[in-house]
């Protein structure tokens, strides 16, 4: 199942922001780059206290996910697309458990194609990486 359009990371600018400022978690088949929701320090009327408010409600409201798979993984587009579909399907099942506002990029490693990785393995590794990065809603 494909990710909803509201949950897709599309622009080059967004990908670059995640790579530049995000945290990194490594697994055997995937690498997760995650960028926490954007917050701004806005001064209140009382200068002694500062309040934190979201900069853009668009980025806070939904989680954005992108998948990067290089030709180093496989020269054949059929193989790369199959891996991408399996990861997307696993992410679709995890989507309701994820905290809003995060921007995530999953980078597929060449070991994913070499070991004939299947969907349950991707699901297990995705859960592990997301838990390490504390992306789950309520950090469950």
UniProtKB/Swiss-Prot annotation:
GO terms for biological process: tRNA 5'-leader removal. It comes from the Bacteria. Signal peptide: none annotated. It catalyses: Endonucleolytic cleavage of RNA, removing 5'-extranucleotides from tRNA precursor. InterPro entries: Ribosomal_Su5_D2-typ_SF, Ribsml_uS5_D2-typ_fold_subgr, RNase_P. One of its GO terms (molecular function) is 3'-tRNA processing endoribonuclease activity. RNaseP catalyzes the removal of the 5'-leader sequence from pre-tRNA to produce the mature 5'-terminus. It can also cleave other RNA substrates such as 4.5S RNA. The protein component plays an auxiliary but essential role in vivo by binding to the 5'-leader sequence and broadening the substrate specificity of the ribozyme. HAMAP family: RNase_P. PANTHER family: RIBONUCLEASE P PROTEIN COMPONENT. Belongs to the RnpA family. This is Ribonuclease P protein component. The lineage of its organism: Bacteria, Bacillati, Cyanobacteriota, Cyanophyceae, Nostocales. The gene is rnpA.
């Amino acid at each position: 199942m494909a990710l909803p359009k509201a949950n897709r990371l599309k622009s080059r600018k967004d990908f670059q922001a995640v790579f530049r400022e995000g945290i990194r978690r490594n697994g055997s088949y995937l690498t997760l780059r995650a960028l926490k929701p954007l917050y701004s320090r806005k001064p209140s009327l009382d200068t002694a206290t500062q309040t934190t408010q979201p900069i853009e409600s668009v980025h806070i409201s939904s989680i954005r996910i992108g998948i990067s798979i290089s030709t180093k993984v496989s020269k054949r587009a059929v193989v790369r697309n199959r891996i991408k579909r399996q990861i997307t399907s696993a992410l679709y099942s995890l989507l309701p458990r994820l905290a809003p506002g995060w921007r995530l990029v999953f980078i597929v490693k060449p070991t994913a194609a070499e070991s004939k990785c299947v969907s349950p393995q991707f699901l297990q590794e995705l859960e592990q990486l997301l838990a390490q990065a504390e992306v789950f809603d309520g950090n469950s």
